[in-house]
């Protein structure tokens, strides 16, 4: 919970260590940045990408934080900041023929979302 200035009140939510490439999640996040809460929900629910699910969970969490901690109405919220950072990369090996092993990289990412409401 952050209060900046007189009229902007912000609530934040985070998702860490999501097993997905940050590049793929940024493609989704760029579509909802700066939009209203309800508009972002519509966009995320109808996009056909797997990365929409964790972003949708973070958006629900940020809206719940704004309602519970700050007493804001969900219809008055807008997304002020969304950030996707790279997390640690899990390194695995895939066994191959003749005793070889091919490396597999499993990237992770951290999603941070901030919603603001005007009181």
UniProtKB/Swiss-Prot annotation:
GO terms for cellular component: chloroplast; large ribosomal subunit. The keyword Iron-sulfur does not apply. It is found in: Plastid, Chloroplast. Pfam families: Ribosomal_L22. GO terms for biological process: translation. Keywords: Chloroplast, Plastid, Ribonucleoprotein, Ribosomal protein, RNA-binding, rRNA-binding. SUPFAM superfamilies: Ribosomal protein L22. Disulfide bonds: none annotated. Transmembrane segments: none annotated. GO terms for molecular function: rRNA binding; structural constituent of ribosome. The keyword Transmembrane helix does not apply. It comes from the Eukaryota. Belongs to the universal ribosomal protein uL22 family. Part of the 50S ribosomal subunit. This protein binds specifically to 23S rRNA. The globular domain of the protein is located near the polypeptide exit tunnel on the outside of the subunit, while an extended beta-hairpin is found that lines the wall of the exit tunnel in the center of the 70S ribosome. This is Large ribosomal subunit protein uL22c. It comes from Chlorokybus atmophyticus (Soil alga). The gene is rpl22.
């Amino acid at each position: 919970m952050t209060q900046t200035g007189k009229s902007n009140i912000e609530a934040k939510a985070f998702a860490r260590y999501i097993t997905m490439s940050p590049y793929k999640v940024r493609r989704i996040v760029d579509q909802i940045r700066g939009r209203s809460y309800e508009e972002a929900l519509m966009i995320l629910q109808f996009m056909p990408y797997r990365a929409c699910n964790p972003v949708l969970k973070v958006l629900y969490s940020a809206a719940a934080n704004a309602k519970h901690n700050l007493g804001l109405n969900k219809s008055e919220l807008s997304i002020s900041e969304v950030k996707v950072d790279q997390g640690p990369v899990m390194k695995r090996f895939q066994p191959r023929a003749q005793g070889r092993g091919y490396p597999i990289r499993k990237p992770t990412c951290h999603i941070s979302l901030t919603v603001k409401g005007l009181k």
